[in-house]
Amino acid sequence: MGVNAVHWFRKGLRLHDNPALKECIQGADTIRCVYILDPWFAGSSNVGINRWRFLLQCLEDLDANLRKLNSRLLVIRGQPADVFPRLFKEWNITKLSIEYDSEPFGKERDAAIKKLATEAGVEVIVRISHTLYDLDKIIELNGGQPPLTYKRFQTLISKMEPLEIPVETITSEVIEKCTTPLSDDHDEKYGVPSLEELGFDTDGLSSAVWPGGETEALTRLERHLERRAWVANFERPRMNANSLLASPTGLSPYLRFGCLSCRLFYFKLTDLYKKVKKNSSPPLSLYGQLLWREFFYTAATNNPRFDKMEGNPICVQIPWDKNPEALAKWAEGRTGFPWIDAIMTQLRQEGWIHHLARHAVACFLTGSDLWISWEEGMKVFEELLLDADWSINAGSWMWLSCSSFFQQFFHCYCPVGFGRRTDPNGDYIRRYLPVLRGFPAKYIYDPWNAPEGIQKVAKCLIGVNYPKPMVNHAEASRLNIERMKQIYQQLSRYRGLGLLASVPSNPNGNGGLMGYTPGENIPNCSSSGSCSQGSGILHYAHGDSQQAHLLKQGSSSMGHGLSNGKRPSQEEDTQSIGPKVQRQSTN
């Protein structure tokens, strides 16, 4: 009997830098590449049509690239635990390869499949390629706990072995004599389904702004690297109106689905930097979003409650309000704040928004204006974002709601001033909220302040054609910052730089604007919500070592006062980061 191999695609939807697939092919007589699609999951999961379309395009592109190698992708309907025992027998499988999945659900699923494979006498190959590092080694290096500050994470990875370079792309030379048995009815049995087959109504669906697939990902990577000046000077692009629109060099959805290898991206950046900088070593900051991605993956890998507040040992237990009506207005872009509504409209239409736009709407939903749980916002992003990733999505929402990783709760974005500073003319608003197109720039961010005559000329009456603001931002943010301050004052084991003592008694005294970037002057929101230029921002730079040492489960456990406010020593900073609590049972 020959060696019959199966590679199971989940993420990692690519032929470049795919070590599990490459090893599976070696020594095999036949290779079948499968993707398992659960039809029930397609109809019931919290995933919107844009992300499903992106996934199906990824699968179509993967199938097209496999065809060039005289192979095909086999899309199989069912659940893995039901599908594999049948395939092992039907195809006489002797070898199965998978990319390592670091998320708790994925680890549990893969453990079950490995058990079934072992019982069937099938060898299982598991290789890491969705992350840069072996996350378990990072945790081991940190004494068995995930690092909960980015500074500590950077310290740990600086001690790791150098990254392995990407493996060679799967080509006809790599496959050699390894063949894929194909049937005449392949497309009927194993073809990539359409959105309609999955039950989606595609009437009115606009063309994809982000085409899925490895081919597109590699094209975008080359465009991204053409920005040699950015790499040479390592300047973060300045935020402007064009930044808010989808870029032909954007990569985040491709990294999320594994159409693009994070290692390939890392080494391409490194090589280009060394060419431009004449072989000098690149700073860690060059890899920005790649390392934040690793940070959140590491924090989440052993925490199945990472996407929940309750039972999550690293999450502050905040008594958020339940307000389904307000949540719906936020999610559907009906808040009455054009900046917020334009962002949520772009998200729903295209499946992507700029990272600072994500910050703005997350702040508005949680600690700044609506006081609604980050879990609710996370679910909306999970549905609508192309690049929604369990670990990163949950981690980002905990961070932006000051529930973990970051506790500078007296920062919030003005839903008028931040947009006006970014795009003074309001072109972004006009693009996604055409109902407001007729307003002059002076009023487009706060149209409720426009005189009635201007509203009539714009053919948009506030409260009739476009909603009035759902909250008074200045008042809501002042009250919510005070609520957050009181919660943090109750945390029994907070260790920082006397952070709470430095919060002004009226942190919103400048009218509702809390700054995000130190050293800038940005528009000030008045109590009416209008903006005026020139107010300074409040910014307290407390360094990474203030990660709160989070507490027992539930608000009832909040304890007995603050720390002494002294800065931790450098030794404490590097050795004592992370929660000192036992994980609660999830039963």
Swiss-Prot record:
Q: Where is this motif: LIR 6?
A: 285-290
Q: What induces it?
A: Expression is regulated by light and circadian rhythms. In the SCN and harderian gland, maximum expression at ZT 6, lowest expression in the middle of the night at ZT 18. In the retina, peak levels at ZT 12, lowest levels at ZT 18.
Where on this chain is LIR 10 (motif)? 411-416
Designated name of the protein: Cryptochrome-1
User: Position of cross-link Glycyl lysine isopeptide (Lys-Gly) (interchain with G-Cter in ubiquitin)?
Assistant: K11, K107, K159, K329, K485
Q: What's noted about domains in the record?
A: The LIR motifs (LC3-interacting region) 3 and 5 are required for its interaction with MAP1LC3B and for its autophagy-mediated degradation.
Purpose: Transcriptional repressor which forms a core component of the circadian clock. The circadian clock, an internal time-keeping system, regulates various physiological processes through the generation of approximately 24 hour circadian rhythms in gene expression, which are translated into rhythms in metabolism and behavior. It is derived from the Latin roots 'circa' (about) and 'diem' (day) and acts as an important regulator of a wide array of physiological functions including metabolism, sleep, body temperature, blood pressure, endocrine, immune, cardiovascular, and renal function.
UniProt motif (LIR 2) ranges: 82-87
Subunit structure, as described in the record: Component of the circadian core oscillator, which includes the CRY proteins, CLOCK or NPAS2, BMAL1 or BMAL2, CSNK1D and/or CSNK1E, TIMELESS, and the PER proteins. Interacts directly with TIMELESS. Interacts directly with PER1, PER2 and PER3; interaction with PER2 inhibits its ubiquitination and vice versa. Interacts with FBXL21. Interacts with FBXL3. Interacts with CLOCK-BMAL1 independently of PER2 and DNA. Interacts with HDAC1, HDAC2 and SIN3B. Interacts with nuclear receptors AR, NR1D1, NR3C1/GR, RORA and RORC; the interaction with at least NR3C1/GR is ligand dependent.
Q: Name one GO molecular function term.
A: FAD binding
Q: Where is this motif: LIR 8?
A: 379-384
Name the cofactor(s): FAD; (6R)-5,10-methylene-5,6,7,8-tetrahydrofolate
Show where the record puts the motif LIR 11: 430-435
Q: Which species does the entry assign this protein to?
A: Spalax judaei
For the ligand (FAD), the binding residues are S252, Q289, H355, D387, A388, D389
UniProt-listed PROSITE patterns: PHR_CRY_ALPHA_BETA
Q: Give the gene symbol.
A: CRY1
Short motif LIR 13, span: 492-497
What family classification does the UniProt entry report for this protein?
A: Belongs to the DNA photolyase class-1 family.
